[in-house]
């Protein structure tokens, strides 16, 4: 089965293309998700600190929905992640492809996990074009071969992957705190000599 076979009516499309630099407006009503907002090896983004703009009559399709999958198609790293919550209206910049799936066929969390696995990543590596900034064509993404188990299995895989990602974030924080603690102790040793 191909990705194209599990899409919702809206399918796959590029995020919003701004004609000029995005100027953050703290009073803005719409968040703009950009590459700089992605953290922890593409595991999530910080909703509260993304740039905001005034609603400039964005088309409805550009507003992210819970369950959308965002895919980075430009550059060396091509990762996907699923939107699991939205605290306010957010659009994605043109750096991302927005993928809307038919949840009766495939779960968005499973699709994001699958697109980040070695088999899919190898497929994307083979399809990349461009020398300065490699990128993927929309059709190559649509033609991604998928393994689509039953929804119950997809859910189990997605939940396990989510727990693994949470563990990775926690372990990274522990490492960071431990490093800071040891550095502080070492500085204290030389200051007390």
Where do the PLM segments sit?
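Non-catalytic DNA-recognition/assembly elements of restriction-modification systems
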Residues: 1-22, 27-28, 143, 148-193
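Short, surface-exposed loop/turn microsegments at beta-strand edges and helix-strand junctions
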Residues: 22-30, 49-50, 62-64, 82-94
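A short beta-sheet element
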Residues: 73-113
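Sequence-specific dsDNA recognition surfaces
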Residues: 4-21, 37-66
